[in-house]
UniProtKB/Swiss-Prot annotation:
Part of the SNARE core complex containing SNAP25, VAMP2 and STX1A; this complex binds CPLX1. Found in a complex containing SYT1, SV2B and syntaxin-1. Found in a ternary complex with STX1A and VAMP8. Interacts with HSC70 and with SYT9, forming a complex with DNAJC5. The interaction with SYT9 is inhibited in presence of calcium. Isoform 1 and isoform 2 interact with BLOC1S6. Interacts with CENPF. Interacts with EQTN. Interacts with HGS. Interacts with KCNB1 (via N-terminus); reduces the voltage-dependent potassium channel KCNB1 activity in pancreatic beta cells. Interacts with OTOF. It comes from the Eukaryota. This is Synaptosomal-associated protein 25. Keywords: Cell membrane, Cytoplasm, Lipoprotein, Membrane, Synapse, Synaptosome. The lineage of its organism: Eukaryota, Metazoa, Chordata, Craniata, Vertebrata. Belongs to the SNAP-25 family. Its main location: cytoplasm.
Length: 54
């Protein structure tokens, strides 16, 4: 019985670590996308100023 509980706990721990790793990867993608949007937004503002429409 104790061995079953230990195995279940180990499995739950492994699943939790896998989920945390996946969430970390998702967060990384979100941060990268936000940075890209900020770069694009900055570029658009610069172009608007250069064209006299901003």
């Amino acid at each position: 019985m104790l061995q079953l509980v230990e195995e279940s706990s180990k499995d739950a721990g492994i699943r939790x670590l896998v989920m945390l790793d996946e969430q970390g990867e998702q967060l990384e993608r979100v941060v990268d996308e936000r940075e890209q949007m900020a770069i694009s937004g900055g570029f658009i503002r610069i172009m608007e100023k250069m064209l006299g429409s901003g």
